[in-house]
Structure formats: structure tokens, C-alpha cells
């Protein structure tokens, strides 16, 4: 399987992809370079597929990759409900794409970045 090195060591590349994938899950869209967006698209689609499987093994695989970040905090009277990025994948995104067989994200190219002229893109979930 081929992948882009992104001018980083393997640990730095894995950390970058984990951070960008978690940000995409939390926010629904991110703006990054085109090469990074193409790599994050692969990992984001894998996380949605794991969410659709929904079993314990898939949940543990997704938990090993997605950062443990708070996605939402809601208050119901005395109770405080905290939702993590992992819970968002399994409770919101997986049911949303239950009848879709892939292609959960889209990449839209934007203007080059000012300063170094890097090709930029917006990566977002398909509605």
C-alpha cells in the first residue's frame, strides 16, 4: 500500500494524521494542504467504516487511532453529558453513512497558500 511521506518520520506522520483526522471528526471540515488532505481522507474513511461495523474490536481499533478529545458537553439539569470524538464516530457519523459504501469525504481545492504557494484544500464530510 502506498502513501505520502509528507516530509516527516513515521511517528511524526502518524501523529499528524491522528490530529487532522480527529479535527475533521470534531469540526466536520478542515483546511490543509492538498497532499495532507488526500492522506487524511483515507484515515477518515477507515474510521467511518470502523464506526459502521460497530463491534468491540472496531471500537478498540478506532480508539487506538482517534485522539481522546471532548467533542461536546451538554447539561441536563444536574447531569453533565460529555461526548468524545470516538463516541461521535459511532453515534453520529456511522448512522449518517449507514447506507453509503464509501466516499464519506470530499476534497475541494482552494487558492494556494500565501507565503510558500502550497496547494491548499478543504476536506469535509459529504452531507
From Swiss-Prot:
The keyword Ribonucleoprotein applies. Keywords: Ribonucleoprotein, Ribosomal protein. InterPro entries: Ribosomal_bL17 (IPR000456), Ribosomal_bL17_CS (IPR047859), Ribosomal_bL17_sf (IPR036373). It comes from the Bacteria. One of its GO terms (molecular function) is structural constituent of ribosome. GO terms for cellular component: cytosolic large ribosomal subunit. Pfam families: Ribosomal_L17. GO terms for biological process: translation. Belongs to the bacterial ribosomal protein bL17 family. Part of the 50S ribosomal subunit. Contacts protein L32. This is Large ribosomal subunit protein bL17. It comes from Levilactobacillus brevis (strain ATCC 367 / BCRC 12310 / CIP 105137 / JCM 1170 / LMG 11437 / NCIMB 947 / NCTC 947) (Lactobacillus brevis).
